[in-house]
Amino acid sequence: MNYIDLHVHSTASDGSFSPSEVVELAKNAGLSTFALTDHDTIDGVAEAITHAQQIGGIEVIPGTELSCYYGNREIHIVGLFVDYQDAVFRKTLDDLKQAREERNEHMVAKFVAAGIPLTIEELKHGNPNSVITRAHFARVLVEKGVCKDKNEAFDRYLGIGCPYYLPKPKVTPEQILPLIQQAGGTAILAHPYSYKMSRSEVEHLLDDTLIPLGLAGMECYYSTYDNGQTQELRSIAYARNLLVSGGSDFHGIVKPDISIGTGRGNLRIPDKLLNDILAYRSHTA
């Protein structure tokens, strides 16, 4: 059996390895396929696909992880097999990136005004095209000795309700799901139990909002889920004829306990899930 990972990040957003390095890591981990799903960008996809073709033995699925709001909760939708060369799709993602950058500049100003010097250059850390997230702020706060680790950074400075937190401009599922579909992608709800929602709340999210908008699947395999959670999510998905997906959410140094393909050591995602996604795409094309 071959194994896959359909949720992976690189330096194109808040990962710590370049797209080419991620390809090498995926191949060395024995994966047959992985999806590069950086936050609100597809900027690393071309590099990853090119490098995979050069070294052979590994396939790259073009993807992205898009943030949106369900009420006051931020949720993430992974788009798999998006057309990363589509001009309209790229323009929309560039607009989302610009909105993030404006938010980041305001957050930097809040830190500086409080006597904690941060710069955008420090956040980008030699990757000028990266999409900056709060994880970048956490890294710099730890490097400067302001916080002992990223958990403290989020608890004291960056979490919702903390003094330096600023929300991103609110994008809705009604905007994100059609965007993925228009780019030829397959929309997957990422890590549904990471939003502090009960099973019934997840089911309402699916039934009332996401499925009517064209959601195709849900991540049921994930680095922090035990077998019971995975099976529960699989049952929710199958009851609604949703695809079952899975991914490690690998970031590298940012999440040092999570390895590509295996998560915290007990994650194995069979390629049958990818075959099911491909079959779905062939029937809906």
Short names for language-model regions:
Residues 1-73, 158-159, 171-255:
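An N-terminally biased module of ancient metal coordination in phosphate/nucleic-acid-related enzymes
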Residues 46, 237, 264, 277-278, ...:
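Generic low-complexity, intrinsically disordered sequence content enriched
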Residues 51-208, 267-285:
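Extended substrate/RNA-proximal surfaces in nucleic-acid metabolism proteins
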Residues 258-270:
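Conserved, well-ordered active-site substructure
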